Amino acid sequence: MTIKEMPQPKTFGELKNLPLLNTDKPVQALMKIADELGEIFKFEAPGRVTRYLSSQRLIKEACDESRFDKNLSQALKFVRDFAGDGLFTSWTHEKNWKKAHNILLPSFSQQAMKGYHAMMVDIAVQLVQKWERLNADEHIEVPEDMTRLTLDTIGLCGFNYRFNSFYRDQPHPFITSMVRALDEAMNKLQRANPDDPAYDENKRQFQEDIKVMNDLVDKIIADRKASGEQSDDLLTHMLNGKDPETGEPLDDENIRYQIITFLIAGHETTSGLLSFALYFLVKNPHVLQKAAEEAARVLVDPVPSYKQVKQLKYVGMVLNEALRLWPTAPAFSLYAKEDTVLGGEYPLEKGDELMVLIPQLHRDKTIWGDDVEEFRPERFENPSAIPQHAFKPFGNGQRACIGQQFALHEATLVLGMMLKHFDFEDHTNYELDIKETLTLKPEGFVVKAKSKKIPLGGIPSPSTEQSAKKVRKKAENAHNTPLLVLYGSNMGTAEGTARDLADIAMSKGFAPQVATLDSHAGNLPREGAVLIVTASYNGHPPDNAKQFVDWLDQASADEVKGVRYSVFGCGDKNWATTYQKVPAFIDETLAAKGAENIADRGEADASDDFEGTYEEWREHMWSDVAAYFNLDIENSEDNKSTLSLQFVDSAADMPLAKMHGAFSTNVVASKELQQPGSARSTRHLEIELPKEASYQEGDHLGVIPRNYEGIVNRVTARFGLDASQQIRLEAEEEKLAHLPLAKTVSVEELLQYVELQDPVTRTQLRAMAAKTVCPPHKVELEALLEKQAYKEQVLAKRLTMLELLEKYPACEMKFSEFIALLPSIRPRYYSISSSPRVDEKQASITVSVVSGEAWSGYGEYKGIASNYLAELQEGDTITCFISTPQSEFTLPKDPETPLIMVGPGTGVAPFRGFVQARKQLKEQGQSLGEAHLYFGCRSPHEDYLYQEELENAQSEGIITLHTAFSRMPNQPKTYVQHVMEQDGKKLIELLDQGAHFYICGDGSQMAPAVEATLMKSYADVHQVSEADARLWLQQLEEKGRYAKDVWAG
């Protein structure tokens, strides 16, 4: 431990550092000081000392809640004058904080978000309607309209109160008073003597503004009490809720403070977020185009559904990147609980204040790279790769923003609708000017919006989500197997999931019961099964699961032996370090102490496709439970499709491209890359790109494949159909939306919408067995449902539903039932093997054609996409799209950065693009860093792809080429990792000097072998352990200097 003195900027006598603060832009002034002084500095003002932190290294430590807790900064103490001990302005040790937190958590669960969705849409539609009615010469004052929108949203969702801001020329009086009060709270920070009589008028206005806010809130409360209304909103929870720990309700004064808190925090930060997001979009047209394309592709209904909003992944990434650059709540304050040393260098005394300067944290180059000022949403493609505590726009731990999911759902919905309905023009070439109060906003930001003339639908009623649920009845022939569904839930998501499971269980003939985990601490039944659904809360069990977890931790093996169970975990990967901690603990501890796990644990992420993951786990779980208890349960969730089919005479009118947001274009060239005499085929295709498409080295071409003629003929033969026959499909289920519903298509065209070669699923097997009239054949099909048989006979052999239908003609499944059970066809992704620096309107791909004897033993297997592409010739049409992979698989910005590229076989594809780019840069006079390409194949006389190009690049000094041949006569098999091992010392030297490392190709054997070789070389060169070498490689990847583009098999 080396103790250091904390840096401090220049002082000015008694005023200390105070004159350095720009009174209008204090946060930006502090950021400038941080740029000069580094990751920590001390800032003194009369009567107080604050230590500002900027690096993830120190902030990670300061976020340890056992050593530091939320501090009420001086600014928050001033806000406390009107927000009292509300959630945001209370100390953690205050009784009302814990009480309110417990009572209000369910109001921000995933289930609650579904209830708020229709109300959010109500306000969002008002915004769209306002902008639709603007004249062509009128502009939009973005922060002002975003403030109207977010205030109206929290008013309606939280308190069923309509501010009607879009029907006012001036802001609502509450907004005027709130903004003025927040300004005054911040301005007090700049005053050396706040009690100076010169500020008496400010004090008078401050008190008047507080009265305006209190009067409105008191009216909202009084009106609700008088009406007797029981809406499922924040206000009802406040008025009726009781703390589950103490049984105490909130008093009226605290309810007032909570409402003011939510009216401020619930709209100020979100309006700033939306304003910044739109600013960054108009300044980055390529990002705007990508986000708008996603909105158009996903939001296909006139009014977005809750599920569609959850599917706006790129829009969510845009919002996160806006929060990274300008987090609208730009700081949070902590204090040391005891004397301690921060970072092993800076001593702190008990009570010392720390301030996390979030915009600086989000610009830590050791985490985010050198391009921290660039707006690049792709940083958030893989949130789990972002180091812990590197991204903190919502605060920390138990004091993090309770409304995070509310804010992000609202912002995603609104931004998605804006992008769907409007094109935006930055007609003033606006330069960013950030206004600071307690939050940040771009001041004076205006744009013009041109309507895309897409009609709006009606606003859904708040009960839409609930009314859409199926009412399940008890099974007619119930087997009554006991099923206890236990839950641990603070926010309601786990409880709702548990009750859903119990509802389904009843329809399947079980005798279900639902209870909290705590109610069965020390009392788990041995009869029947136990399903456990629980969340984690900052790594701790929910309030109604604490006793159970404590009991389980100390329980003996005798207390759980004989219990048959499965666990489903609810979580949120935004809290990566504690994600699934409690569900995993329960599952692993029960198993370790002798309980029997009858279905694998499920894990669902609230920030991703929670429902999709839950449904997938649920399907497998019911199958496993039925197999364990030898039950013949009705699969009422999956097999009863309402898909109807009628034969008609009409041509197909729905292009496949529309389903996937792709474009149709021409093949410019197609040639074979394997040498004559080779038994295999690798095709090089060059694709013409439309003017709106662009790409960079390392991108993928997503291809919409077509099922080949042979497999289509097998389907039509099995069902006795003519491939040219025209049909029309009708269905109501959302899960069938991938089909061309209410359209007229041929049987052949319909079969291009579905996957025909996926392994048969358990759902499909059960459906086939139910339709099989030959008892021995039905037994054979049902036998495949057994866990080991399914693994060995279905998954390992990739046995398909079509193959089984051909084997068992006694299965009387209808063609419509067959189609309804098939998944949507999936795009296949190929690394682009060219550089746009050579031709920006042409891209090439390198395709290994897959064919051979089917693992299932039923004839020949042909890869759908590779064989489709192999048959394309110059002038043929292809449906495809550009996709940027999630990894940092692109050339470094600095051409002098050394490169190490490993790409055997078709894995060389992206590196061909890299080589072309480097050649162009060299011809432009750029100095290039070393570049080493490790390429492997069977033989230089058989499958040396792009041999002439690569050898020419080496002779021109573009790359150093290292080759490995695995099928040379009288020579041992040599793979790329063997050649790398010989160069180990050189490779580690390059990586120590800042080289970037890339792997492309087989991810099942080649990539792990290459990684193992590289880690061994690092350990040998630096004399460190295997664990240290693995950590080094992981850190290399986290820093964006190691990227993989690999696939299985």
UniProtKB/Swiss-Prot annotation:
Q: Where are the transmembrane segments?
A: none
Chain residue ranges for the region called NADPH--P450 reductase: 473-1049
Q: Pfam families from the xrefs?
A: FAD_binding_1 (PF00667), Flavodoxin_1 (PF00258), NAD_binding_1 (PF00175), p450 (PF00067)
Question: In biotechnology, how is it employed?
Answer: This protein is a target of protein engineering. Its selectivity-directing and activity-enhancing mutations have been extensively studied and the designed mutations allow this enzyme to act on non-native substrates and/or in order to enhance production of synthetically desirable end-products.
Reaction equations catalysed: 2 oxidized [cytochrome P450] + NADPH = 2 reduced [cytochrome P450] + NADP(+) + H(+); an organic molecule + reduced [NADPH--hemoprotein reductase] + O2 = an alcohol + oxidized [NADPH--hemoprotein reductase] + H2O + H(+)
Induction, per UniProt? By pentobarbital. Expression is negatively regulated by repressor bm3R1 at the transcriptional level.
Annotated compartments:
Cytoplasm
Q: From the record, give the cysteines joined by S-S bonds.
A: none
Location of the Flavodoxin-like domain:
483-622
Would I find Electron transport among this entry's keywords? yes
Q: Where is the site Important for catalytic activity?
A: 269
Query: What does the UniProt record report as the effect of altering residue 402 to E in this chain?
Result: Ineffective covalent modification of the heme macrocycle. 2-fold apparent limiting rate of flavin to heme electron transfer for arachidonate-bound enzyme
Q: What family does this belong to?
A: In the N-terminal section; belongs to the cytochrome P450 family.
Functionally, this protein is described as follows: Functions as a fatty acid monooxygenase. Catalyzes hydroxylation of fatty acids at omega-1, omega-2 and omega-3 positions. Shows activity toward medium and long-chain fatty acids, with optimum chain lengths of 12, 14 and 16 carbons (lauric, myristic, and palmitic acids). Able to metabolize some of these primary metabolites to secondary and tertiary products. Marginal activity towards short chain lengths of 8-10 carbons. Hydroxylates highly branched fatty acids, which play an essential role in membrane fluidity regulation.
Q: What is this protein called?
A: Bifunctional cytochrome P450/NADPH--P450 reductase
Tell me which species this is from.
Priestia megaterium (strain ATCC 14581 / DSM 32 / CCUG 1817 / JCM 2506 / NBRC 15308 / NCIMB 9376 / NCTC 10342 / NRRL B-14308 / VKM B-512 / Ford 19) (Bacillus megaterium)
